[in-house]
Swiss-Prot record:
Belongs to the UPF0102 family. GO terms for molecular function: nucleic acid binding. This is UPF0102 protein TT_C0005. It comes from the Bacteria. Pfam families: UPF0102. The lineage of its organism: Bacteria, Thermotogati, Deinococcota, Deinococci, Thermales.
Amino acid sequence: MGALRGRWAEEEALRFLLGKGYRLLWRNRRTPFGEVDLFLEKDGVYVVVEVKQRASARFGAPLEAITPGKVRRLLQSARFLLGRDDLPVRLEAVLVHGTPKDFRLEHLVLEL
């Protein structure tokens, strides 16, 4: 995903999640395990959100880019950012299908 398109997709994902009552804690935070796109909180649960965007299915669906290894690294990043591993953490994805002129969002909870 290009930098401008990636930024746009993250903006749309964040707007969507804030509208659902999430509270933003960090954005684009780097850890030794990788970067966290969005780190939020909702109802006492910390939520790591991976944002994936595809303009078309030519290079695969956005979900295909979220591998088991990526899920593991996201969880490690969450624990690193929190500084402990006994707090409730949920991993989610916002998949952005399309372009700024014509898109739809898909919001998923990722299995650990």
